[in-house]
């Protein structure tokens, strides 16, 4: 739900800063997090 989406956004930010969580960078982290959330 909404909370899950927020978690996904946070993960995406981490991906951008850290160099790519799940090898997806900001776009992959944000999109993947939202889908999973």
Swiss-Prot record:
Residues 16-37 are annotated as: Disordered. Disulfide bonds: none annotated. Keywords: Amidation, Antibiotic, Antimicrobial, Fungicide, Immunity, Innate immunity, Secreted. Expressed in hemocytes (at protein level). It is found in: Secreted. The keyword Secreted applies. The modification Lysine amide is found at residue 36. GO terms for biological process: defense response to bacterium; defense response to fungus; innate immune response; killing of cells of another organism. The keyword Zinc does not apply. One of its GO terms (cellular component) is extracellular region. Antimicrobial protein with activity against Gram-positive and Gram-negative bacteria, filamentous fungus, and yeast. Was tested against Micrococcus luteus A270 (MIC=0.5-1 uM), Echerichia coli SBS 363 (MIC=9-16 uM), Pseudomonas aeruginosa (MIC=0.01-0.3 uM), Aspergillus niger (MIC=3-6 uM), and Candida albicans MDM8 (MIC=1.5-3 uM). Has no hemolytic activity against human erythrocytes. Belongs to the glycine-rich peptide family. This is Serrulin.
